[in-house]
Curated annotation (Swiss-Prot):
Record-linked InterPro entries: PsdUridine_synth_cat_dom_sf, PsdUridine_synth_N, tRNA_psdUridine_synth_TruB, TruB_C
Record family assignment: Belongs to the pseudouridine synthase TruB family. Type 1 subfamily.
Name of the gene: truB
KW Chaperone (keyword) present: no
Organism: Rickettsia typhi (strain ATCC VR-144 / Wilmington)
CDD domains named among the record's database cross-references: PseudoU_synth_EcTruB (cd02573)
Protein name: tRNA pseudouridine synthase B
EC number: 5.4.99.25
GO biological process assignments: mRNA pseudouridine synthesis; tRNA pseudouridine synthesis
Catalytic activities: uridine(55) in tRNA = pseudouridine(55) in tRNA
UniProt keyword terms in alphabetical order: Isomerase, tRNA processing
Domain of life: Bacteria
Keyword Isomerase: yes
Active-site residue numbers: D39 (nucleophile)
Functional summary from the UniProt entry: Responsible for synthesis of pseudouridine from uracil-55 in the psi GC loop of transfer RNAs.
Length: 292
C-alpha cells in the first residue's frame, strides 16, 4: 500500500474534491484525503495525504498557511468574492498609504465572523447551502491569528490592492478582506486568491495539473514525499522491539524520558510507528500506523 504526501497545486475552476478524484483515478484504490479545502475559484497549494498519511491530516489543517489575495475596493458582494452579487457600494477608495498602513491593525489575535458562503455546518447543513436558499444564518465569531499581513501592490486607478498574509487555521480571507476594507472606510471583495504554503508544503515545488497533462502513477510516485516529512521538527523517540509490540497492541509502554510531552512521535527501525503524548514517562498513543 502507498503511504505518502503529494504537494499539489489546485488550479482555478475545480473543487478540492475534484482534484482528489483525479488523483484517485491515477493511483488506484488507495485512501486519499486533502488538508484544507480551497474554494473552486481559488488556486494554490492543496496537500494530499495517501494511505496512512491520512492519519496525519489534522496536523496540516492546524498548520500555518500563507495566501496572496487581491482586493477590489468600492463594493461588497453577497459571497465575498467576484463571483457574487453586488449588495452594496461606496465611492470612497483608500489611498496607497492607507492601503499599506492598515495591515498593522490586523496582525495578532483577532475575531472573525465566518462568511455566509462557507462550509461551516449549521444544524448539520453547510452554511453555503442555506445561503443559496436565501436563508439568513447567524454565525458566531471565531478567534484566529494573523501572523503577518502586508500590502504588495496598490493600483489606485483600478481600486485594487494585493496583500500577503500568514495566518492560523480557520482564517477566512474573504472575511479578512471585508474587514480590512471597512477599516479603510470603504467596501471590498476578493478578486484573486492564491494559497502559497501549507505547513512544509510550498508552491515552488508543487505538482501542477492541467486537462492536457498525462500524469501517470510513476510520475506521482517520483513526486511523493515521505510520510514523516511533516514531523521533522517534532520530538521523536525510538522504540525497542518490546516497546513497539506494546504500542502496536495498545498496551502500557514506558520510555526512559522524564519530561511530559504534549505531542511526539515514535519510530521503530527508522519507520513511523505512532503519534501521541508522554505523561510521567508513559506513552499515550493517539494514532498507530500500519507501516511495518
Amino acid at each position: 500500500m502507498s503511504n505518502y504526501w503529494l504537494n499539489f497545486y489546485k488550479p482555478k475552476g475545480i473543487s478540492s474534491a475534484k482534484l482528489v478524484n483525479i488523483v484517485k483515478k491515477i493511483i488506484g484504490k488507495t485512501k486519499i484525503g486533502h488538508a484544507g479545502t480551497l474554494d473552486v475559484e481559488a488556486e494554490g497549494i492543496l496537500p494530499l495525504a495517501v494511505g496512512e498519511a491520512t492519519k496525519l491530516i489534522q496536523l496540516l489543517i492546524d498548520a500555518k498557511k500563507t495566501y496572496i489575495f487581491s482586493v477590489k475596493f468600492g463594493a461588497q458582494t453577497d459571497n465575498g468574492d467576484y463571483t457574487g452579487k453586488v449588495i452594496a457600494s461606496k465611492n470612497y477608495i483608500p489611498s496607497q498609504e492607507e492601503a499599506y498602513a492598515v495591515c498593522s491593525k490586523f496582525i495578532g489575535n483577532i475575531k472573525q465572523i465566518p462568511p455566509m458562503f462557507s462550509a461551516i455546518k449549521v444544524n448539520g447543513i453547510r452554511a453555503y447551502k442555506l445561503a443559496r436558499e436565501g436563508k439568513v444564518v447567524e454565525l458566531k465569531p471565531r478567534n484566529v491569528t494573523i501572523y503577518d499581513l502586508k500590502c504588495l501592490n496598490f493600483d489606485k486607478e483600478k481600486a485594487i490592492a494585493t496583500y500577503y498574509t500568514e495566518c492560523s487555521k480557520g482564517t477566512y480571507i474573504r472575511t479578512l478582506t471585508e474587514d480590512l476594507a471597512l477599516s479603510l472606510q470603504s467596501l471590498g471583495f476578493v478578486i484573486e486568491l492564491r494559497r502559497t504554503q501549507v505547513g512544509i508544503f510550498k508552491e515552488e515545488n508543487a505538482i501542477h495539473i492541467k486537462a492536457s497533462d498525462a500524469i501517470t502513477k510513476n510520475f506521482i510516485d517520483k513526486k511523493s514525499i515521505k510520510i514523516e516529512a511533516i514531523l521533522d521538527d517534532i520530538l521523536v523517540l525510538d522504540a525497542t522491539d518490546d516497546q513497539a509490540q506494546k504500542i502496536k497492541y495498545g498496551q502500557k509502554c514506558v520510555f526512559d524520558y522524564e519530561e511530559d510531552v504534549n505531542f511526539l512521535w515514535v519510530r521503530y527501525n527508522g519507520t513511523l510507528l505512532a503519534i501521541g503524548s508522554l505523561n510521567k514517562s508513559c506513552f499515550n498513543s493517539l494514532r498507530v500506523f500500519n507501516l511495518l
